[in-house]
C-alpha cells in the first residue's frame, strides 16, 4: 500500500519516510461438514502455506507478505497431512473485497484443480459480510480483518459480532464459542485474559477453521523535510513524532 502526503505540485519531489507491515490480514475460514473433514481442511491450508502460492501472488511488487502468525506470537500450525487424504471433488469459495482476493481466489482455484478438486468461486462485491445469503452455500470464505490499537480486543469482537461466524460453525459450536468468550472476558487479570484469547484462536487454527493468508506492506512518502510520519495498525496517520527541519536563515 503506497500512501503519499503532499500537495499536487509537491508530488514530483516526494520520497519514502516510513514503511512497515500492517497487523491487519486477509483470512480464510473453512466450514467443517460432511463435505469437508478436519484433515481435508488441513490439507487445503497446508497447500496454501507450503506450496509457495502466497509468495507468488501477482498483486503488485512488495504489496503483501505471506502471514506466519495471526498476531505476533500467535503462529500458524503446520501438519504432516497423510498421503491418503484426498480433497472433495467440489468445493465452493465465497469471498469479499479487497481486490487482492480476486487473484488469491483464482490461484487457489487452479491449485486445488491440480489436486482433483473443482473450486466454484462466488464474489460478494462488498467490504464486509453485510449480506450473508451467499454464505449458506460456502465451504470456504475469504475476507480481511483490520486490526485496531487493541489487537486482542479487536479479534475478540470479531468473533462475537461478525455475521460470518454463525455460518462457519453449527449452532452448538457457535454457542460454545460465545460462552468461551464470555468466560475469557470476565478474567480479571489482563495477561491471563489475553493468553486465554490466544488459546481460543490457536484452537481455531489447529482445527483448520481459520488461517491468516497475508498482511500488507505499507510505504508512506512525503515531500522533503517531512519526517517521523507513520501509520497505526488501524490505518490512521500518526503525527506525534513528525517533525520539520528548522527554516534556514
Regions found by a protein language model. Name each.
Residues 5-8, 33, 95-99, 144-146, ...:
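Structural motif
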Residues 1-13:
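Ligand-site clamp/hinge motif
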Residues 69-73, 115-128, 170-171, 243:
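A generic structural motif
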Residues 13-20, 28-38, 75-83, 132, ...:
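Short, solvent-exposed loop/beta-turn-alpha elements that line the ligand-binding surface or hinge
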Residues 22, 32-37, 45, 96-100, ...:
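Extracytoplasmic/periplasmic, Sec-exported soluble proteins
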Residues 42, 54, 63, 121, ...:
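Extracytoplasmic/peripheral linker and loop segments enriched in polar/acidic and small residues
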Residues 36-110, 114:
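Append "and occasionally in soluble cytosolic enzymes with long acidic Gly/Pro-rich linkers
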Residues 3-5, 115-160:
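Periplasmic binding protein-like
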Amino acid at each position: 500500500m503506497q500512501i503519499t502526503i503532499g500537495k499536487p505540485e509537491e508530488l514530483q519531489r516526494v520520497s519514502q519516510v516510513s514503511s512497515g507491515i500492517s497487523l491487519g490480514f486477509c483470512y480464510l475460514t473453512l466450514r467443517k461438514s460432511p463435505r469437508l473433514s478436519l484433515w481435508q481442511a488441513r490439507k487445503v491450508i497446508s497447500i496454501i502455506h507450503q506450496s509457495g502460492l502466497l509468495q507468488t501472488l501477482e498483486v503488485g511488487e512488495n504489496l503483501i507478505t505471506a502471514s506466519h502468525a495471526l498476531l505476533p506470537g500467535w503462529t500458524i500450525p503446520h501438519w504432516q497431512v497423510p498421503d491418503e487424504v484426498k480433497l472433495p471433488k467440489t468445493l465452493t469459495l465465497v469471498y469479499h473485497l479487497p481486490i487482492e482476493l480476486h487473484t488469491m481466489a483464482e490461484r487457489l482455484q487452479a491449485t486445488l484443480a491440480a489436486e482433483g478438486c473443482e473450486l466454484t468461486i462466488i464474489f460478494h462485491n462488498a467490504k464486509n459480510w453485510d449480506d450473508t445469503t451467499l454464505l449458506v452455500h460456502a465451504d470456504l470464505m475469504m475476507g480481511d480483518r483490520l486490526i485496531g490499537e487493541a489487537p486482542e480486543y479487536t479479534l475478540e469482537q470479531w468473533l462475537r459480532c461478525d455475521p460470518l461466524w454463525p455460518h462457519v460453525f453449527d449452532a452448538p459450536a457457535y454457542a460454545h464459542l460465545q460462552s468461551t468468550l464470555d468466560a475469557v472476558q470476565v478474567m480479571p487479570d489482563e495477561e491471563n485474559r489475553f493468553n486465554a484469547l490466544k488459546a481460543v484462536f490457536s484452537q481455531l487454527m489447529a482445527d483448520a477453521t481459520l488461517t491468516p493468508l497475508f498482511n500488507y506492506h505499507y510505504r508512506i512518502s512525503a515531500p522533503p523535510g517531512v519526517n517521523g510520519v507513520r501509520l497505526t495498525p488501524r490505518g490512521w496517520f500518526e503525527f506525534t513524532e513528525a517533525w520539520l527541519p528548522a527554516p534556514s536563515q
